[in-house]
Regions:
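Radical SAM enzyme [4Fe-4S]-AdoMet core and its adjacent flexible, acidic
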Residues: 2, 218, 222-237, 241-340, ...
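N-terminal [4Fe-4S]-dependent radical SAM core
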Residues: 15-48, 63-101
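Generic structural signal for well-ordered beta-strand positions
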Residues: 47, 352-353
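N-terminal pre-triad scaffold of radical SAM enzymes
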Residues: 90-116, 134, 141-150, 345, ...
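Conserved glycine-rich "GG(E/T)P / GGGxP" loop and the immediately following alpha-helix
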Residues: 101, 105, 118-284
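Local cysteine-cluster metal-coordination motifs and their immediate loop/turn environment
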Residues: 107-117, 356, 391-410, 426
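Short Fe-S-cluster ligation motifs
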Residues: 135-155, 421-451
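C-terminal accessory region of radical SAM enzymes
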Residues: 301-331, 356-404
């Protein structure tokens, strides 16, 4: 048996092995040419065994301490699924970790060909909302130990001064109260300058920047021009270099459909041949068609089934250039986006639970100034009570601890303004292929332990 990854998530399993054990419910096993893969989604351990080893383990009534530590076996008396489901329910009430998204502006200076937001209102984060955000945090002082802030829009940099003002307060608040702080931004990257890059990274402590680049210069400029029609690629490319120079982690988000898929390898070549190689991350995303997207988009987008091989081919190519690693999925926070501490705050203080519903008033759950006293709409109460066990698609799936049931909004409701209408996470279609390639690479490098 080859061990490629040990228990990294459930260290309590390094205890005494019980007298009676069973094969863990959370073992996701599948064959590859080299044998049988077993990935335990609760512990994160990953092993490869021969077919005979696998058959023998399935029949085993006892196990070694190492197999127990890996999580491949569980106490025979334990209902692993029900125990996880109860933990999931408890996780929804966890407010020790606040995950706040701020919409600094609903405006945008781009005219992207696939934009979902339609006519963008001229709204920026109000001073009154900023005051209410401060009060919200002050009231919760001492109840949480970590704060993650996401800056979003529209285009959040249109509200640049709001980011500066609110960041200054939040950083002082966290430092004075011993709260761990982390901050990220999703931006088109155009309104940055060298001075702004330095201020955002060093003063505002925004460490992660998700910036969409949809191809090489000609293709990107066709898809993501300014409202005036002017191209944006050169400016964004320079700004990304400045961010990296100041120590930021930049993620190239590449939105892919049938119009630009063939151009993406050329973009990857450009990144690999630049000083950005090894310093940035790549995130491949499928273009979605939904509600407010342009009418002619339908024939250009990939279905989930169509996109999976396209994505895997690009992952392989990016890997060959040293731009991407084959990835094993991470565990989602217990309770997922249903957690009480996970909210999105709009420009006027309105609260959403899902980024994909921004701008639709029917999905507003309340307001930041009355969050503890305002009556909740019935749909929201039902939403908060949802668990993966309520979904036919989730029930019986062994990947639940990794995705926390995926998107509960898509599981319960059929309409929203934008984003995927699928419940499952976007990494799922190529999940096993990535594991297979990960194992093959580790074998070639002789990076594994034997048992």
């Amino acid at each position: 048996m080859k061990i490629f990854r040990n228990n990294i998530w459930e260290n309590h399993l390094q205890s005494v092995v019980p007298n009676e054990v069973k094969w863990s419910y959370w073992n996701d096993c599948f064959p590859i040419p080299d044998g049988e893969v077993c990935f335990n989604v609760m512990t994160g351990s990953l092993v490869l065994m021969s077919n005979s080893e696998y058959e023998n383990l399935l029949k085993a009534k006892e196990c070694t301490s190492k197999l127990w530590e890996l999580g491949l076996f569980a106490d025979v008396k334990k209902d692993e699924y029900r125990e996880w489901l109860n933990t999931y329910r408890e996780g929804k009430n966890d407010e020790s970790f606040l995950d706040l998204t701020f919409l600094t502006s609903r405006q945008c200076q781009f005219k992207c060909t696939y934009c979902f937001e339609g006519l963008k209102p001229k709204k920026d984060l109000t001073d009154e909302t900023i005051s209410h955000i401060k009060s919200f945090l002050e009231k919760r002082k001492g109840s949480f130990q970590k704060l993650q802030v996401y800056w979003f829009g529209g285009e959040p940099l249109i509200g640049y001064n709001k980011i500066i003002t609110l960041s200054d307060y939040i950083i002082r608040f966290c430092d004075n109260n011993g709260i761990e702080y982390d901050s990220s931004i999703t931006t088109n990257g155009y309104a940055l300058t060298r001075e702004r890059c330095e201020e955002l990274v060093k003063s505002c402590r925004i460490s992660r920047y998700v910036i969409t680049v949809d191809g090489t210069e000609e293709v990107h400029n066709q898809r993501r021009p300014l409202l005036s029609g002017k191209g944006t690629f050169k400016t964004i490319w320079q700004n990304i270099h400045w961010l990296v120079d100041f120590g930021a982690h930049v993620v190239f988000r590449i939105t892919i459909d049938k119009e630009n898929a063939d151009n993406i390898p050329l973009l990857l070549d450009k990144i690999a041949q630049s000083s950005l190689a090894g310093k940035v991350s790549i995130a491949l995303a499928r273009t979605f068609e939904i509600l407010n997207t342009p009418e002619d988009l339908g024939s250009k987008v990939y279905s989930e089934r169509e996109f999976a091989p396209v994505e895997m081919k690009l992952i392989d190519y990016a890997h060959s250039l040293g731009l991407m690693n084959y990835r094993l999925p991470h565990k989602a926070p217990l309770g997922g986006c249903l957690r009480k501490g996970d909210i999105t705050i709009g420009t006027d203080g309105e609260i959403y639970k899902c980024l994909d519903t921004i701008g639709e008033m029917k999905w507003v759950t309340g307001s930041i100034d009355k969050i503890d006293s305002e009556p909740q709409p019935q749909w929201y109460k039902d939403y908060l009570n949802w668990t993966p066990d309520d979904s036919n698609q989730c029930r019986g799936c062994k990947l639940q601890p990794l995705c926390s049931g995926g998107c509960p909004h898509n599981a319960m409701f059929s309409d929203k303004m934008h984003g995927s209408v699928l419940q499952c996470p976007d990494w799922k279609p190529n999940y096993r292929l990535q594991i297979e390639r990960y194992i093959k690479e580790k074998i070639e490098k002789n990076e594994f332990d034997l048992l």
